[in-house]
Amino acid sequence: MSERKLFTSESVSEGHPDKIADQISDAILDAILAEDPEAHVAAETCVYTGSVHVFGEISTTAYIDINRVVRDTIAEIGYTEAEYGFSAESVGVHPSLVEQSGDIAQGVNEALESREGDTDDLSHIGAGDQGLMFGFAINETPELMPLPISLSHQLVRRLAELRKSGEISYLRPDAKSQVTVEYDEHDKPVRVDTVVISTQHDPEATNDQIRQDVIEKVIKAVIPADYLDDDTKFFINPTGRFVIGGPQGDSGLTGRKIIVDTYGGYSRHGGGAFSGKDATKVDRSASYAARYIAKNLVAAGLATKAEVQLAYAIGVAQPVSVRVDTFGTSTVPEAVLEAAVRQVFDLRPAGIIQMLDLKRPIYKQTAAYGHMGRTDIDLPWEHLNKVDALVEAVKTVL
């Protein structure tokens, strides 16, 4: 009997309370960066019935209308009706933002290396905090992402498209998806075992109608037919009713969907969230750099699966560690890959910011449907422009 294994990942829509919070935090970040690319931002958001609280630490020369940014973001998501219990024009907005701590700022603005005499411009900025970050890539999909999270994201994105186009008129903004994929004894995906979709809806929509529309217009439109069979299980709104949703049903907070944001649990996670943070925060920028490295390693044919760990000390520019784990799939020793990575990629915070051009207002678009593996938007850490350099670096190390 062949060994088969199941793996499950989930995603949530842009109308999920935690994702509303993420999008507001990143909309504020983008608005500030558009005026002041050198700003330091850590913006947190909490949403619940009829209310939005924005708090955190910001150092900037920019002035933005936070009230307007919040309302525009909520309206863009689709919360425009009072009956939803949370609407763009009636919600209360309560900002409470203060300046970044001077103790933190001194280590970010002048790294330990710079204070000790290193005159390289890229050694000037220190990491905004200590921490460990992971990046991952695998050859399961064209975008080099694990299949379960890739399908989960596509399902909730499809729901949003059908809602916004009016093709399914009874849909409301809040939704979740979950996909269980079956793998064979060689860890290759062979079929989809289970799909769970919960979608908020108008009260007059029937369960039968929702089930039929979701299966035909969402699941079958997203998941390739080769992965579906007579044994694939569909759970559509399994509670039986999902009228009350969004912040009326659950409070939401920035940074509570870090597994959805990354690899769906298929790879390790350092614990740091992304949204609302400028690129001096290595929780965000180094996670993007680690994905960039892993994706280029796999695309170069140096491994079929790669996980990259980076780690930093607060106020220090150089990472304290760089690790590459290929789970036995690499074509050369992992120590060679690590040496090649250090040659090709400048992993100081300023080096990452320069390499990926991270002082731009590009973050709000990442705050729903995943920060990694996106094919619908152009993100610099998804580019495959380091493949040749890695191959050449491996040759020099060997």
From Swiss-Prot:
GO terms for cellular component: cytoplasm. Its main location: cytoplasm. Its EC number is 2.5.1.6. Pfam families: S-AdoMet_synt_C, S-AdoMet_synt_M, S-AdoMet_synt_N. One of its GO terms (biological process) is S-adenosylmethionine biosynthetic process. It is found in: Cytoplasm. Keywords: ATP-binding, Cytoplasm, Magnesium, Metal-binding, Nucleotide-binding, One-carbon metabolism, Potassium, Transferase. One of its GO terms (molecular function) is magnesium ion binding. L-methionine binds at E57, Q100, D250, K281. Residues 100-110 are annotated as: Flexible loop. It comes from the Bacteria. Its cofactor is Mg(2+); K(+). ATP binds at H16, D174, A175, K176, R241, F242, D250, R256, K257, A273, K277. It catalyses: L-methionine + ATP + H2O = S-adenosyl-L-methionine + phosphate + diphosphate. NCBIfam families: metK. Belongs to the AdoMet synthase family. This is S-adenosylmethionine synthase. The gene is metK.
